[in-house]
Amino acid sequence: MKTSMSIFAAIGLAITTTFAAPESDTEVAARKAALDLAGAFSNEGFKMRDGHWSGTIKPKEHALIAVNLYSGNQYWFSVGATEPAKKISVNVYDETGRLLRTEHYDGGDRAAAGFSPTDSGQYFVSVDLVQGGSSSFCLIYSYK
């Protein structure tokens, strides 16, 4: 229950992050890192969604992004971060705040989570700074 509350409390951060001012150079660098990672999934037939989410993430804070997903599709959520981030993670939660089982790629300042929902609906993607200092990040997701 505590996880559910912290997830939904972070929605404000996600909204602020999503509708921020024009991107800084570090956010552009984070987007490049995320695009490089997402490109690997494109080689497996995944198509990148238009748009991305970027902003700044601090240690022990979450960036939370609400997404609508459809059953029958497969998704990969790719995240890139800039220095001084040392390790970043990405997780997927259902609408009740329950952590879902995903495939993971962990590459230090890049991470990805793969997921195939059994039900269509709203899900939440959490980006967490595990190690390092406050950093720019970018989330891109792909589907097939």
Short names for language-model regions:
Residues 22-23, 51-136, 142-144:
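Acidic, Ser/Thr/Pro-rich low-complexity intrinsically disordered segments
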Residues 6-16:
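Bacterial N-terminal signal peptides
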Residues 8-9, 33, 48, 65, ...:
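Generic detector of short alpha-helix boundary/capping microenvironments
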